[in-house]
Amino acid sequence: MGCTPSHSDLVNSVAKSGIQFLKKPKAIRPGCQGGSERGSIPLLVKNSTCYDAGEGLAEEQPSPRRNQTTAKGLCQLMGDPASGKRKDMEGLIPGTKTSSSQLNKSQSHMAKDIPFKTQGSHGSQGADFSGDESEESSTQDTSKWKRTAKCHTSSTQSHCYQTIHPAHEPEGKVDFPEPLVKAHQQAYTYLHSSLSKYEAILCIIHQATQTRELLQPMVSFLLLCFEEISQLLGEISKDGEVLLQEVREDLAWPLKKREPQEQPNLLQQLLQYTVSKLQVLNGTVASLTGSFLEGSSSYLHSTATHLENKLSTKRNVDERLLRALRQLESLASGCGDPGVQGLPLCSEDSGIGADNESVQSVDKLGKQTSWDLAPEPEEWKSVTSPHTEARQSGHTWQQSPFCLGSGRPQDCLLSGAPMAKVQPRAQDEARSPCLSSTSPENITSPPLKLGTSTPCDSFGIGVSVEPHLSKTSRPMDASSLSDSEDSSPEEEEEDKMSSMSLCAWQEKTPHSRPQSSPADRESPFQARTRRLRSLQAQEMILKMKESISERIKFVPVPCGHQDWSEEEEGRTVVPPRPSTVSGSRRAPERQTRSQSESCLQSHVEDPTFQELRRVQRDLSQKLEAFYALGAKGQGQSQEQILQPRAAAVWPNGTCRVSPSNTTSRLKASLTKNFSILPSQDKSILQKCNPHPEDEQGKAGKLPNAIPSGEVSEAAKATDWNVRGCPTRTSVKKLIETFSPTESLRMLGDSKDAGASPCLRNCIMPPRFPKYTGLAPLYPKPQISPASGRESLKMGIGWKPLAPIFPPLPKAEAAKSEELSCEMEGNLEHLPPPPMEVLMDKSFASLESPESSKSTENSPKETQEPGPGEAGPTRRTWASPKLRASVSPLDLLPSKSTASLTKPHSTGPGSGRSSCQPRKPALDLSSPPATSQSPEVKGGTWSQAEKATSLYRQPRKAIAWHHSGPPSGQNRTSESSLARPRQSRERSPPVGRKASPTRTHWVPQADKRRRSLPSSYRPAQPSPSAVQTPPSPPVSPRVLSPPTTKRRTSPPHQPKLPNPPPESAPAQCKVPSPPTQHPEASPPFSIPSPSPPMSPSQEHKETRDSEDSQAVIAKVSGNTHSIFCPATSSLFEAKPPLSTAHPLTPPSLPPEAGGPLGNPAECWKNSSGPWLRADSQRRAALCALNPLPFLRRTASDRQPGGRPQPPTLDPTSTSYESQLGQNSSSEESPKKDTEPGSSPCSPELQGGTRRASPPEFCVLGHGLQPEPRTGHIQDKSQPEAQPQQEEVS
């Protein structure tokens, strides 16, 4: 079209500005495009703009001239600067496909100039079309250039005269009319949109082909079946005929032998009867087979008719579509010179004919260039005919600019970015400076008529375009392109992951392109791309090293990509988190990404260098150094990093701002290298964790103990930590900042995904499984993050529900999953707890004074948040808010009123505390909780320290913790809930990570919800427990023996816990009057299987308890006192608690380990556990028998514990009143016990269920330092201690 003046301007600008003109010529470029095939390609690129703007076809039409002109101009361009070449190209409109071969030669040369010209023409086109002018002016005053372009036209043309022909001058700079541009935009919109439909068609036809392939043998089989039927019937008839021939005369009496009276006809009658029956059978078979065959025949005939109709319809549609496409093509060609444009349509310039050669080249270049529009290239490649594809190639190439802005400097930048990828090939001839500008030309060149010389021409043009882009988009391209070139193989993947960066979209686009144009196009240019990449890669490596040394300060484009980078970061972090869950990566990834970004800035060097070491061997040394740092921190970071990741998520705002395209890429690559991110998170953890050292030390242990599980839990913990880790100083702020959205989310999702938002981010897969069974848990999650406060406030009402639901599911899931997945799940379960434990611990330490009092209840609440890991962390931060909003209800009521606290505690405590992730967190958290309650009750700090050291046993800690809070609330129901919780706590990681567990939990949870909620929801559980103790004890006791049996059996069969919980729910349903207590008791029965499970775990727990023997021994007394009330209900639900006591005995053996160990075994193996289970059930049912259970706990811990439980039963009954107080106190004791359980946390790893039994023992001790020292105190002392604790 009249783009030649633009070329002249481009030439002038090129001559004057050198590379700068590359930017300016963009505005002028329309002329160049019109004049040169490159111009036409830019037109195609423009056409991409034009395709978007409707220019593609119009531009395409002139492109024939441009192709010819460009061919000649390109030939001259070799000799002359781009300006002359451009003008010549434009002036040479008629004829140079041959010169296009020259262009190939001079393309490296021209590529440099042409990029400028092409970009200039693009600029003018863009200005004319989409405001390329404005962007060009931003690049180089495109409009000014256009104005000056006319003046320059003469000067540029003079250049052209020197180099090419003055032909450009006559052409004059012509802007594409708005209608033309819009028409082309619409046309390309149509073409691109149709590509996806063609994809769908291909997919459908593929499916149809497969179906037919399956159907054909089926139909053949049908025919074979009928053939077989006919054959068998024929055999029957043939045999009958043979028979008739043989016996025809002998079937009846001989006529003359005897008189008819004397001839018995019995045989004949029998034969007649049989034959008549056979005839009936034959008639049935004949009708059946005949009707079926007729039906099949009619069906297939009808199908054939329908297929014929479909065929005729499709042919009509094909004709219509072909007509439309032909008209579109003819109209496009009609817009320009008919003769010339007919040729361009089949020429590279138009992109139609170029599809095969130039488009292939472009696709190759595009892959190299990482075209901006990865999808677009595919679309255009699919939809556009060869010429259209060439155009679209350019268009697609430019469309990415168009996406950024059709005529904007971004166009140049975008085109530059794609060029950058094309660059590699073009870059061979054009230098790396041309790389970015080459890309557009490369794209442009395919449309050029360089059909035969397309590879070289495209390449050359790509090169020429590249210089311009280099300047215009070089800032972005230089870094992103160099990056992409540098790590083009891996970085392309990274770019794909981080499409936000030019390199990302560039490289994505090339992949699309290759799809449109198969490897053919790729191979020719990719070799060059490799060479160019080597150059760029070196530069980029240097840049990367510098930026990395500066902690990746070269963040190219943080603009809207930051969010994406955060997401990518999440991916980066997420992979390590969800070792068990990869599906949940992305949600956590975002937060993790921001964490990664912040970590990248702080400790990103480690991950970045690690990734660079992968992607860039030049950076291997630095990466190794950082990797070593990462390796060091990985042990800590795996736990800490999870917290730091949360912290990273917490500092997400700051971190996310920093993410750059490079950072995104690095993170994308880091996503592959998860260990790197832990290093990053490590630094964040340091920021977030007030007690990183303590927790890190634990984390160090735990990472070793549970490296893989920790990763998965790290993912969870990360999310929990996102809210929980900052809880100390900025947790509240973060919760407030993130909590609004998350609170809203959690409030909205809390029922379904209360903690799921965090979990989704951190552990989407585990949580989703949990979702199945976590409807109740979600309300608890609401309590945990931001919604934790809000949802606790509004969720207090449904806390019981949520707790009731989760507790049983947790118990069941914990039992079944912990038993089955104890070995596997322990790691899974433990790792998240360590993370959260670390987080919780520091948070607990921070919160301990504040939440120490509320901790007793808060643990319940915080346990309530238990969407798993969030529980502990959320408890810490949620403790203030949840305690403020919910604690009054749960904590105060639980302390003052067993009923109120019990429902809440049971709800939150059972449900949330069951979060196994929280067990570790509760370990640390429980120490905080313990410290909190000890602060309330004194001497909890040592427990917290112990818990910190024992945080390895998060599960146990959490289980005990759960038992503690539930007992405070509704001991009867809580006991049942507590055990499920404890089981769940032990298996919450499993539950969280294994939806099956939670799925199982859900039924139980539902049952509990039905039955327990009645007690919990009414908040009458303790009253009911007190009131219904007599009758509930009966039914509970009746139920409890089965439960006890279950307890015994679950140890043998890990799955038993689930079935027993189910049956226990049934039992719970059975004792509907004692629903509050009996229901709780049946759940306890359900948990009882958990204790049986503990036998196997007991060994593990015994080992672990040995680690925490001192702590447990100290806590044992407290556990007795605290757990007596809580245990009665919680522990009824938690025969494993008695097992825990056995575990505790192992841990207590230091003081009274031997005796305790024996009681533990007795608990598991002997009727003692059953008795305890019965007592517990009774206590749970009566809610007054916690003490008996406590005694049992004590007895478990102590050899004489069994006899004591009966003695304690009266005390338990007498403690009914204390149960409310004890429930709150016990919750703290349970927390304390959890610290003790923390010691058993390693044991938990060994045996999750065991962890819960020790929990009972530990809880009492943890709550009361005195009981710790006197854990072997008489049952009466534990009782007194619970009372004292209750008082406190």
Curated annotation (Swiss-Prot):
Coiled-coil region list: none
Functional description taken from the UniProt entry: Plays an essential role for normal photoreceptor cell maintenance and vision.
Pro residues bias spans: 1051-1063, 1071-1094
Tissue expression summary: Specifically expressed in retina.
Biased composition (Low complexity): 1018-1028
Polar residues: bias regions: 96-109, 382-401, 434-453, 848-857, 894-904, 927-946, 966-976, 1209-1226, 1278-1288
Main location: other
Record lipid sites (S-palmitoyl cysteine): 3
InterPro entries, sorted: PCARE (IPR029352)
Annotated GO CC locations: cilium; cone photoreceptor outer segment; photoreceptor inner segment; photoreceptor outer segment
Acidic residues bias spans: 483-495
Biased composition (Basic and acidic residues): 1097-1106, 1268-1277
Name listed for the protein in its UniProt record: Photoreceptor cilium actin regulator
Disease link: Retinitis pigmentosa 54: A retinal dystrophy belonging to the group of pigmentary retinopathies. Retinitis pigmentosa is characterized by retinal pigment deposits visible on fundus examination and primary loss of rod photoreceptor cells followed by secondary loss of cone photoreceptors. Patients typically have night vision blindness and loss of midperipheral visual field. As their condition progresses, they lose their far peripheral visual field and eventually central vision as well. Cone-rod dystrophy 23: An autosomal recessive form of cone-rod dystrophy, an inherited retinal dystrophy characterized by retinal pigment deposits visible on fundus examination, predominantly in the macular region, and initial loss of cone photoreceptors followed by rod degeneration. This leads to decreased visual acuity and sensitivity in the central visual field, followed by loss of peripheral vision. Severe loss of vision occurs earlier than in retinitis pigmentosa, due to cone photoreceptors degenerating at a higher rate than rod photoreceptors.
Lipid attachment residues per UniProt (N-myristoyl glycine): 2
Keyword Transit peptide: no
Region (Disordered): 78-147, 368-401, 423-453, 467-527, 563-605, 686-707, 813-1109, 1132-1169, 1190-1288
